[in-house]
Amino acid sequence: MEKYNISLRQITEDNFMEAFHLKLANGQEHFVSHPIRSLAQAYVYRNQCQPFGIYKDDTMIGYVMVIYDYDIPEYDIWHMMIDESNQGQGYGGIALDLTIAYIKTKPFGTSDKVTLTCHTD
């Protein structure tokens, strides 16, 4: 999945440590969980979710996880973040477009509903 030089790559044993180095700008920690927590959730919900690194060329600049809620049914976009050093350049919008394109393939089930989540505190 690539648009311009931004792409989504599945988080695997080969790249998960890169996600641990991502940082939010000051004050943003209240709106999104760090990838460490998200990857723990991805393990628990592994049959209904897919975590991705957001890459600019070959450098991870962000993280997003897609999870399918079988009860509703709907797709949720969890923990989307762009590293503080890459914010303000339009990469988040491109990554969101790529994430929605992935969801449209209906990897876990059928639904036309997508929710983008964030912490409200």
Question: What does each model-identified segment do?
Answer:
Residues 113-121:
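Conserved beta-strand-loop-alpha-helix junction that forms the acyl-donor binding cleft
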Residues 2-5, 10-78, 83-85, 102-109:
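Acetyl-CoA-dependent GNAT
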Residues 86, 90-98:
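Conserved acetyl-CoA pyrophosphate-binding loop and the N-cap/start of the following alpha-helix
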